[in-house]
Amino acid sequence: MTKVAINGFGRIGRLVFRGLLDRTDLDIVAINNPSGPETAAYLLKYDTVHGRLNKKVEIDKDDLIVDGKRIHVFQDRNPENLDWSAYGTEIVIESTGKLKDKESAEKHIRGTVKKVIITAPGKDEDATIVVGVNENIYDPAKDDIISNASCTTNCLAPVCKVLNDTFGIKRGLMTTVHSYTNDQAILEKAHKKDPRRGRAAAENMVPTSTGAAKAIGIVIPELKGKLNGLAIRVPTPDVSLVDLTVELDKPATKESVNAALKAAAEGKMKGILAYTDEPLVSSDFKTTDVSSTVDSLLTMVMDDNLVKVIAWYDNEWGYSMRIIDLVAFVAGKF
């Protein structure tokens, strides 16, 4: 088993932890949570969105014990002070949301640590990988700092790949209707980057930026510069959707677009992309493992080559499952 540690025990860090508990190929040995083991245990055990963890959670000094498994809890904001090697850690999952550039993330690499997976879009990272789309680019010899991209890119990329491979994409625009996150405010306050994100998240639809569309050009190079988009944050705690409109190179119909997406969901992208023909709503996709679920009832085609596709995603749980998949993929190359 490959030994794994998590730096940062927020929304994504805790869900990745939950997922790792059931793996037989990956062994979670340590976390870093400056708030301490008591807070870590409490927030791990109780989750408003995804429910109570159905495992026994205990604390023993600086360790969590989950169903008898002991996991050490560091409490230090400086990555250079984290002795991951004391627990044989080989891969660090960097989920603080703060150490997103290569220079910061690679501070984890020393001793037994070989690779770092950033749970966000990176900066100057060695590779950005969306599992199911471009993991073939991974070079174990030189790619040590790897970004898992964003949850929205993980939803968008599989759909774009299928459409581009089948019909060709000339250009497109996307909107993510996205559940609010901890980057927003419950009540109004100043926001360091975007004044709209400082408005009350549970009371407003909040237009803001997303880098997901432009990031597609990193994951699928032939689409570089062909997509752009924005986000509308909405008053729900989890589950989002991508509304993608593209102009295609080849003529298409609603039936042919849906057929291509369904074939991918049942074939080469199974477990990454899913397909539904039921009239579902956001809560139906809570705690779904896939990156993206195409809502075939909402597919539209105009004038043979203007296409709209709607895809749902659990921006927390689905994304966390892809992080685990990426860790397992990287570990498999050791």
Positions of PLM-derived features:
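Catalytic core of tubulin tyrosine ligase-like
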Residues: G168-A231, P237
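Hydrophobic alpha-helical scaffolding
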Residues: A149-S150, M205-P207, Y313
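Short, solvent-exposed beta-strand edge segments and adjacent coil->beta transition regions
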Residues: K142-D143, A200-A202, V239-D243, L306-K308
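Generic secondary-structure signature for well-ordered alpha-helical cores
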Residues: L21-D25, K161-I169, S179-N182, T210, ...
